[in-house]
Amino acid sequence: MAYKNSWLQAVREGRQRFAAGIDIGSQHVRLVVVSQRARGALHLEHMSTVPLAAGAMAGAEIVDRQAVARALRDAFAGLPRVCATHALRCAMAVPSSATLTTTVPLARLAAQSDCEAEDGGVALAGLAPAVMGEAERIAGLERHALAVDWYVDEMPSPVRSVKIAATARQHLEARIECAATAGISLSAIDGEPHAALRALRHAASRELDPNEPYAAVWVGTDGVYGWSVVDGSNVGEMRYPAPEHADLADALRDLLQGPEFDCALIGGEIDLLDGVGFSLADIGDVLGCSALPFECALLGSHARELDDALLHEPAGAVAFGLALRGVLE
């Protein structure tokens, strides 16, 4: 019996999940909507770039919440009907300049808590007070004013560690309020570099050979972030500007500690490189490999014709990475 186009085939393929990634930049709101079935291909459903009113943003801070809410409404106004009639998981990013991160040995936190370093699952909940103490220390704020995320890093290492990220609660509350004013319910808030890295890693899985060493670089309004990826694992990272680096080229050389790269994938607002006298080709020269700009257009089938410039702009990395999180979780 043929099940093509039948309800039984739809059940076998799994429910189609829809997710939106929202990137609030200094001058634009960028929206990417994707969908995917459990074992199916990724579909690009909708893209939109909406300019923000001048003065709406001041660094990481939302100054004019009404202007941001209007831009969000405009970005979602052209949402295809098929997206509007499905549950849409929406994620938004917090700029890295508003987020502080640290890595702490698990054993040290365990010694301050009532759980063993080798415990897992529920037992690790005992780490929470010690984690909050570390977050207060790096942020210089009391815990009631902080939003904190943390996890045990499972990457192979001689010492197990805990990754901690903290941001002022006001940054999250402002984004949640703007989204709610626009009629949008957020299911997740992520950091810009993490969302961009997720997008770049996905691009590598589609465009590069398996196990091919590569560099992932993201250019944001507050700096340049880079990662070296070998056998699917992040083995090195860099950030610029940073006190230890004289210039961007010096920072990029931090990634050259392992195997030679075959390729560097570059996302973000690449035009900002002009401000430090750099270019896409210069990144490739420093890393000793070809440099390819990130493009959403290459990463999924198009459910319908898409004409927004974001389809081919490296600046779409954060919004795409946020949307990708929604269909993968």
Q: Where is each model-derived feature located?
A:
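Hydrophobic/aromatic-enriched cytosolic interaction surfaces used to assemble or bind macromolecules
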Residues: 1-329
